Swiss-Prot record:
Enzyme class per UniProt: oxidoreductase
Protein name, UniProt field: FAD-linked oxidoreductase hmp9
Enzyme nomenclature, EC number: 1.-.-.-
Pathway the protein contributes to: Secondary metabolite biosynthesis
Span of the signal peptide: 1-29
Superkingdom: Eukaryota
The keyword Glycoprotein is annotated on this UniProt entry: yes
Residue intervals of the FAD-binding PCMH-type domain: 152-337
Positions glycosylated per UniProt: 80, 133, 356
SUPFAM superfamilies in the record: FAD-binding/transporter-associated domain-like
Main function: FAD-linked oxidoreductase; part of the gene cluster that mediates the biosynthesis of hypothemycin, a resorcylic acid lactone (RAL) that irreversibly inhibits a subset of protein kinases with a conserved cysteine in the ATP binding site such as human ERK2. The first step is performed by both PKSs hmp3 and hmp8 and leads to the production of 7',8'-dehydrozearalenol (DHZ). The highly reducing PKS hpm8 synthesizes the reduced hexaketide (7S,11S,2E,8E)-7,11-dihydroxy-dodeca-2,8-dienoate, which is transferred downstream to the non-reducing PKS hpm3.
């Protein structure tokens, strides 16, 4: 079933979800901590020694349920009255499937049926479009499934339906007063579980929506003229998804750089971590689109970050990932629509299926060498391939390669001319592989997007993955490329999925001159990204999960790093367990971001795994978040 879903998603050129079957970007995946003066008594109460971090005294660990410092039911009830009854005591989505007072087979059947629906997941504060770890799986009793165990796991125990800025600030204040871990979630679309936290209070932004407004000519909120941008802009005031922003863009006949999937949040984690999509090669990554942002800091104050004020925070938001504050509002660039988008579709399947399918992998290596030149010519898009799949992948084949790549603003003739040398290079495989291709041209960007990408994908499954930015030197030698392809293709029983994302080059390279960019510099020299992933069953023991995770980190991830040793990975679709995540996700800019983190969040309130400053904390076996 995994392969069928993946084939459908990436066949339709789904961006990140497509290939990975993973998660939901948290606009802002970050927990919070507290003011030193407020937290010192809690540190002493817990018996831990207060830490002195500059001007900050704070307890070493956050409170968790069951401890003496955990708020009583009366305190939670009082807080709920303070915020107008918007506090939610969370419970697992599938708890109705398990023995106990909440068991309800009718509700369980509904949950099982809707589990893969993205709105079903997003409409719950503990819903995750691509959960990092499922600890209460739905049970299909009609299919003969039987319940195992059910718990919240790393999901929050309380959530605030934060529809106003005041309620966001009240939530942060309560968390600081009580030394609680906080997570911030808008869509729950995050691939690394950065929106999760054991025993946390969640600031749920799903309904924090005010307005999406089009500006024919961008005007900075404070009159700042340093951006140099004189084109159009879209003002996104609230935790909207890309599908909402796309409606406004299409109505005004402009292009915005959004996700290939429509479900991620348009502000916060997706752009701050990089943010790629069908238009990013031509117009820049999501991080490059941000013209300004309004951010709530840990003390509840709201600041404007742009080219004129809070410029260090502005830079961090444009590539440094989540964890600096709660992003409430952004303005992004918008571009004139185009008259044509030409798409090339290619499928390759073995004529004779074998366990290793070596001929297919030979062809994949040829294509990997061809991508930089195709990207130079203007091609962008997504490809994916599998050595083996448990079920049918392309037609009746259980292995194969498929891509949809396109040229924005160019004709079919130009697209054919560019791909012709690659097709010729593939001809040597025609006795062993079935190779099919076709072209399609659309008369504007949005006709292309709605047909080739941006569809409503199935969700709710878990994978682990690793990613690598691929520069030109990495693919100069065929034998080195083929060696890497062999490893990431995995053993026949791995059923690994590999995705090639031609989302860089073009304007992404040109934006290297932007001094306000906070992206890993490796983006500016790498035409494409490779992602290697493996699926994990909904119900699995930890030993089996660890075996898959270790394979991704120490086998497939290591092979990609060997292939491209001087680049890095894409933080929004990377390996949470990567021991070198600081170097791989941030590169040489990390010290700058860490200084910004310490300036705006000296208490580490907005902690999230693999985010800036995460190395200063650890999660204990009891689930506590503690300073090292």
């Amino acid at each position: 079933m995994f392969c069928i879903i993946r084939a459908q998603l990436l066949l339709l050129l789904h961006l990140l979800v497509l290939a990975l079957l993973l998660v939901g970007t948290v606009c802002n995946a970050h927990p919070q901590h507290g003011h030193p003066s407020e937290l010192e008594p809690l540190a002493l109460k817990r018996g831990g020694s207060p830490r002195d971090d500059g001007n900050t005294l704070a307890p070493r660990c956050r409170c968790i349920p069951g401890e003496a410092c955990w708020p009583s039911t009366q305190i939670w009830d009082s807080f709920n009255r303070t915020i107008g009854g918007s506090l939610i005591k969370t419970a697992p989505l599938a708890e109705s499937c398990y023995p106990g007072p909440k068991k309800n087979t009718r509700k369980c059947a509904v949950v099982s049926r809707k589990w893969t629906d993205q709105d079903f997941q997003t409409d719950s504060p503990v819903g995750r479009t691509y959960p990092y770890n499922i600890t209460c799986a739905p049970v299909n009793y009609f299919a003969g499934q039987r319940p195992t165990t059910c718990s919240l796991g790393q999901l929050p125990v309380y959530a605030i339906d934060a529809r106003t800025r005041q309620s966001v600030a009240q939530g942060l204040r309560f968390a600081k007063d009580n030394n609680l871990r906080v997570t911030v979630v808008s869509t729950g679309h995050d691939l690394l579980g950065r929106a999760d936290g054991y025993g946390s209070l969640e600031i749920w932004l799903r309904h924090h929506r005010n307005e999406i407004r089009f500006e024919r000519q961008y005007m900075a909120t404070d009159g700042c003229r340093e951006s140099g941008w004189t084109g159009s802009a879209i003002d996104i005031d609230g935790a909207y998804q890309w599908r909402d922003v796309h409606i406004k863009a299409r109505a005004n006949n402009v292009i915005v750089v959004g996700g290939g999937s429509v479900s991620p949040g348009a502000i916060g984690g997706w752009p701050s971590g990089g943010g790629h999509g069908p238009a990013s090669r031509n117009y820049g990554l999501g991080a490059d689109q941000i013209l300004e942002a309004e951010v709530m800091l840990a003390d509840g104050s709201v600041v404007l970050a742009n080219h004129c004020q809070h410029t260090d925070l502005f830079r961090a938001l444009r590539g440094g990932g989540p964890g600096f504050g709660v992003v409430l509002k952004t303005k992004i660039k918008a571009y004139p629509n185009v008259a044509s988008v030409s798409v090339h579709h290619l499928t390759i399947t073995p004529i004779r299926q074998t366990p290793n399918n070596s001929d297919l992998l030979d062809a994949v290596a040829v294509l990997m060498q061809a991508y930089p030149k195709l990207s130079d010519d203007g091609y962008a898009g997504y490809a994916f391939w599998l050595r083996n799949c448990k079920s049918f992948f392309i037609g009746s084949a259980k292995s194969g390669y498929r891509h949809g790549i396109w040229m924005i603003g160019k004709t079919t003739e130009e697209a054919e001319h560019s791909f012709a040398p690659v097709r010729e290079a593939l001809d040597k495989f025609k006795s062993k592989l079935t190779i099919s291709e076709s072209y399609m041209t659309y008369n504007d960007y949005w006709s292309f997007y709605t047909s080739e990408s941006g569809l409503y994908e199935s969700v709710g499954t878990t994978s682990v993955l690793t990613s690598r930015l691929i520069d030109r030197p990495a693919v100069e030698d065929y034998n080195r490329v083929r060696e890497a392809v062999e490893v990431i293709g995995g053993k026949p029983e791995d059923y690994a999925t590999n995705v090639m994302m031609l989302v860089s080059n073009g304007q992404v390279f040109a934006d290297a001159a932007d001094k306000s960019s906070g992206l890993n510099p490796a983006w500016r020299v790498s035409p494409y990204v490779v992602i290697s992933s493996r699926g994990i069953p909904m119900v699995v023991d930890q030993a089996s999960r660890k075996e898959v995770a270790d394979d991704i980190t120490y086998v497939k991830g290591a092979a990609l790093q060997k292939l491209a040793p001087n680049t890095g990975g894409y933080m929004n679709e990377g390996d949470r367990n990567d021991p070198n995540y600081i170097k791989n996700f941030f590169g040489t800019i990390y010290p700058t971001h860490l200084a910004t983190k310490k300036k705006y969040d000296p208490w580490g309130l907005f902690y999230c795994p693999t985010c800036v400053g995460a190395e200063l904390f650890e999660e204990t076996s009891r689930g506590e978040l503690c300073r090292r």
